[in-house]
Amino acid sequence: MCSQLLKTQSPVSLRLFFLTQLLSSSILVWESTKATTKSKFVQDCVKLAYGNDSSVVREDRFAGVPALSGTGACRLFAEFQRRFYPDSQMFLPMPTWSNHHDIWRDSQVCTRTYHYYDPGTKGLRFQALVNDIKNAPDRSFFLLHPCAHNPTGVDPNYEQWKEISHIFKIKNHFPFFDMAYQGIASGDVERDATAIRIFLEDGHLLGCAQSFSKNMGLYEHRVGCVSIVSWDDKQATAIKSQLQRIVRAMYSSSPVHGPLLVSTILNDADLKALWEEEVKVMVDRLISMRITLRQTLEELNSSSSWEHITKQVGMFYFSGLSPEEVNHLQRDFHIYMTNDGRISMAGVTRSNVDYLASAIHEVTSVNNSNCIDSKHFEFVV
């Protein structure tokens, strides 16, 4: 059985398998140390997001609890916001991950949107974003994607984050960062935390949702954390007690297996280095496929500009394809994506990138005399 496993497992899943087996041998110990394990996990999450040398970490100025991945972390914060800031709203970027709207709506927190993406340039609509932040009521709540914005893959640069932080400070806004892709934007987990650390350096109180579904491949383990930065350790203790009350009524207790996997990796120098190396390998492949897709489209002499493919970062390529073009790809080429044109770059490989590029070229060519007759492709795959 072991030899069969060695033949079929990928390097990442094989290492995770052996680590899981190692931890499984200690399952009886876990049962007696769940509270300690989860407390350590929260510490590890906060250090990863805020930095080992952050004053927030040194002074224990944070409240945090394990959550059921990123969705659970956002849901906990939304409930916290509803209970203690009942008249507040959450400003969401337009567009954002569709589940954000459902999470805050189900928590009975009103949502509004702020400008973010420019369909014309397929880039950041920065000045409109800044204006919306300035025009929002003082002390508003804003959800921010610190890296690898979902679905657009468009992130502010360092100077833009500094300006955003400055305006937040003037307006006394509260930033809530949903960090589902730390490491997936640049291949460097430290670099991808830059936005959050800019806000911390500027003295903001803030909230953060973290998920290890993508960067550690622990999707089915539902491993996440929500943390809130406070003025002092006493306030942090009070906030934590309220978060724990919400957890108790919502799902009582989170699993311990996933958090222990994360803590084991983050506290072992060799394992952490291996993890960071594998994240970079994964991101390098995504970048490589972006370059290949762009080059292939440009070689087809497309009249469209495709530079946004390589300017965007993260798992997704926000293509800018219209709903009609998306439907055309599905109907005639059996290429599937979300209706807003978001393509998962993880599904693009060297064996299918030419086909994908040709199909995109076909549906975006206005006067293409070689358009495929859809009647010839009426079959189910």
Q: What is each stretch, according to the model?
A:
Residues 22-172, 182-184, 189-201, 321-322, ...:
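Conserved core of the PLP fold type I
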Residues 60-61, 308-314, 338-342:
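Short Gly/Ser/Thr- and Asp/Glu-enriched loop/turn motifs at secondary-structure junctions
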Residues 111, 175, 206, 336-337:
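Hydrophobic beta-strand scaffold residues
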Residues 119, 154, 189, 214, ...:
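Hydrophobic alpha-helical scaffolding
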Residues 179:
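Walker B catalytic acidic pair
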Residues 201-279:
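Conserved core segment of the aminotransferase class I/II
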Residues 274-332:
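Conserved PLP-binding catalytic core of the aspartate aminotransferase-like
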